[in-house]
From Swiss-Prot:
Family according to the record: Belongs to the bacterial ribosomal protein bS20 family.
Protein name listed in UniProt: Small ribosomal subunit protein bS20
Gene designation per UniProt: rpsT
GO MF term list: small ribosomal subunit rRNA binding; structural constituent of ribosome
Protein's job: Binds directly to 16S ribosomal RNA.
Stored SUPFAM superfamilies: Ribosomal protein S20
GO cellular component labels: cytosol; small ribosomal subunit
UniProt subunit comment: Part of the 30S ribosomal subunit.
UniProt cross-references to InterPro entries, sorted A to Z: Ribosomal_bS20 (IPR002583), Ribosomal_bS20_sf (IPR036510)
Keyword Zinc: no
GO terms of biological process kind: translation
């Protein structure tokens, strides 16, 4: 437990940010899983709407620095490839 006032504040801030980051990352993962579930069930329309939601969540994670932009691009590319494979 920190004794210095600024260190106490930083600990509190770090805990708040950790929880906030975890919720954003969790929402991103959930959106990705929804796309993959739709693809597995051969639901093309549902997969396309889920893909736009997943892309939005992934981009928000990039904007806040949770995920590297290249990693996000890879996620989105793989999901798009799966969704496009349904309609083909």
């Amino acid at each position: 437990m920190p004794n210095i006032k600024s260190a106490i504040k930083r600990t509190k801030t770090n805990n708040e940010r950790r929880v906030h980051n975890a919720t954003i990352k969790s929402a991103m993962r959930t959106a990705i899983k929804q796309v993959e579930a739709s693809v597995a069930n051969n639901e093309a329309d549902k997969a396309k709407t889920a893909l736009t939601e997943a892309a939005k969540r992934i981009d928000k994670a990039v904007k806040t620095g949770l995920v590297h932009k290249n990693t996000a691009a890879r996620y989105k590319s793989r999901l798009a490839k799966k969704v496009n494979g349904l309609s083909a």
